[in-house]
Design a protein with these regions (language model features):
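Glycine-rich, flexible loop/turn motifs
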Residues: 31, 40, 72, 110, ...
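Unchanged
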Residues: 77-165
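Cytochrome P450 catalytic domain signature, combining two hallmark sequence patches
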Residues: 167-169
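Compositionally biased, intrinsically disordered linkers/stalks adjacent to structured regions
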Residues: 171-173
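Aromatic- and glycine-enriched beta-alpha-beta binding-site module
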Residues: 60-88
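Generic N-terminal amphipathic, Lys/Arg-enriched alpha-helix
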Residues: 1-12
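N-terminal strand-loop-strand
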Residues: 36-71
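Acidic, metal-coordinating catalytic segment for phosphate/diphosphate chemistry
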Residues: 11-47
Length: 173
């Protein structure tokens, strides 16, 4: 995946998100090891928005370290593209076997502060998010990254999170 080309395609699809795209592009220009999980002041992460096939439910995890409900995702391993990392994270963190990719293009972008944990100081996550679907009746499993992983009815999403970037994911589709 050529990230610059993917950002250009994303800009065409979501012209109202120019500010976040500009920040991503500036980060890519100014830094070398953008996918190294130890890179500071931040690094790119791969996330997945998983909705049920009938689009009535979304899959969220209660993140162990953050203590809040968010989409699944994580760090990009050496040699992986963001999309490959998204596939791996989706499988590892949900255990779902019915996963399918809806679109190879970027579905959403987000930039946020990640708190200091252990030896890693506070840093910035540049999330590249992809859209997946799965069978909403398939039972997900927890992973070491989560306290819980569960399907949530879309109309109840705000009972679990008030995070604007998660709400935006749901509003996109």
């Amino acid at each position: 995946m050529n990230i610059i080309k993917a950002l250009t395609d994303y800009r065409r699809r979501f012209p109202g998100e120019g500010d976040v795209i500009d920040r991503f592009e500036r980060f890519l220009i100014d830094h070398d090891q953008v996918m190294d999980r130890n890179a500071l002041p931040g690094h790119i992460t791969a996330c997945v928005w998983i909705r049920s096939y009938d689009q009535t439910k979304v899959l969220l995890m209660n993140h162990t370290k953050l203590g809040k409900w968010i989409q699944l995702g994580g760090h990009i391993e050496p040699g992986e593209t963001p999309l490959e990392a998204a596939w791996r994270e989706a499988r590892e963190e949900s255990g779902l076997t019915s996963l399918r990719l809806v679109d190879r293009g970027i579905y959403d972008l987000a930039i946020h502060q990640f708190p200091a944990i252990g030896n890693m100081p506070e840093h910035i996550h540049y999330d590249i998010r992809f859209l997946f679907e799965a069978d909403g009746e398939e039972e997900p499993h927890n992973s070491p990254e989560s306290v819980a992983v569960k399907w949530i009815d879309r109309d109840r999403l705000k009972e679990y999170t008030d995070d604007p970037s998660v709400i935006r994911l749901a509003e996109k589709g």
